[in-house]
């Protein structure tokens, strides 16, 4: 006979969400067009009317959020000279996970002369959520990239904070076939206490990263001109043709405002959904 634990595990697995999106875009006569699109499970991507800047895509999670044991995979390729902007229809909520962690895997490839803007709305981690996220990014030497992520530890708009849980965020970026950036953030256990440390978040509940390629000292100076308007902590550095901005704030609203101020200095066009 199957044990009660085995039956419970089987039911849990059967109720986990799965979703995958895979597509490529290419440019012809200055117009970016989508190639073959593969969608499965509860993850979808929709393409509003074409814009002068290129093609825009909006991810929709029909599962209504992410729970423990869920898995979502995204694989996107922008061929030479293509221009693509991606965002999400809403903030992604990651719920409490009594079992395995949720997995989010994103693979991005950008060709020569192509540009990709990855600008999802914030990811909100509920108390005791567990999620492992992985970015694998491959850039041509002549490609450009704007990759922004905001993570909020708790529903700050409701006065809630994430106290316990697990968040693992792994970024790997190669350029011209060489690994040029690798970082893994691991927060687990008593996350609330760790975020309270001065060397971590100084009590902030929202963190963000903006990776800009190419980026240089001139870009840093333009961003510093906006520093007096920042509501939270913002730091930026540049090296080897990259620029990276780090953000920390008390809540999602303040952090988003700071990130928008930084992006305005880069000349980036924000998705309309960010402005609603």
Swiss-Prot record:
Cellular component aspect of the GO annotation: cytoplasm
Protein name in UniProt: Urease accessory protein UreD
InterPro entries: UreD
One Pfam family named in its UniProt record: UreD
Subcellular location: Cytoplasm
UniProt keyword Cytoplasm, yes or no: yes
Family classification: Belongs to the UreD family.
Binding partners and assembly: UreD, UreF and UreG form a complex that acts as a GTP-hydrolysis-dependent molecular chaperone, activating the urease apoprotein by helping to assemble the nickel containing metallocenter of UreC. The UreE protein probably delivers the nickel.
Chain's role: Required for maturation of urease via the functional incorporation of the urease nickel metallocenter.
Keywords for the protein's UniProt record, in alphabetical order: Chaperone, Cytoplasm, Nickel insertion
Keyword Cytoplasm belongs to the record: yes
Single GO MF annotation: nickel cation binding
The organism of origin for this protein: Bradyrhizobium diazoefficiens (strain JCM 10833 / BCRC 13528 / IAM 13628 / NBRC 14792 / USDA 110)
């Amino acid at each position: 006979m199957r044990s009660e634990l085995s039956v419970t595990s089987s039911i849990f697995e059967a109720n986990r969400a799965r979703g995958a999106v895979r597509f490529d875009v290419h440019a012809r006569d200055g117009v970016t067009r989508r190639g073959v699109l593969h969608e499965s499970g509860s993850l979808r991507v929709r393409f509003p009317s074409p814009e002068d800047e290129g093609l825009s895509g909006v991810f929709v999670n029909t599962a209504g959020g992410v729970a423990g044991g869920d898995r979502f995979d995204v694989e996107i390729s922008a061929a030479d000279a293509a221009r693509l902007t991606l965002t999400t229809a809403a903030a992604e909520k990651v719920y409490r996970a009594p079992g395995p962690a949720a997995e989010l895997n994103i693979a991005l490839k950008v060709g020569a002369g192509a540009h990709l803007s990855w600008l999802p709305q914030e990811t909100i981690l509920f108390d005791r959520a567990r999620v492992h996220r992985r970015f694998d990014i491959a850039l041509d030497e002549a490609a450009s990239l704007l990759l922004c992520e905001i993570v909020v530890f708790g529903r700050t708009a409701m006065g809630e904070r994430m106290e316990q849980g697990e968040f693992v965020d792994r970024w790997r970026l190669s350029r011209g076939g060489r690994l040029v950036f690798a970082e893994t953030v691991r927060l687990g256990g008593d996350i609330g206490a760790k975020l309270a440390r001065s060397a971590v978040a100084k009590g902030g509940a929202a963190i963000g990263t903006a990776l800009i390629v190419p980026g240089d000292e001139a870009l840093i100076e333009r961003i510093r001109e906006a520093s007096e308007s920042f509501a939270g902590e913002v730091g930026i550095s540049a090296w080897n043709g990259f620029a990276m901005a780090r953000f920390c704030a008390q809540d999602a609203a303040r952090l988003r405002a700071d990130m928008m101020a930084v992006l305005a200095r880069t000349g980036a066009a924000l998705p309309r959904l960010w402005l609603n």
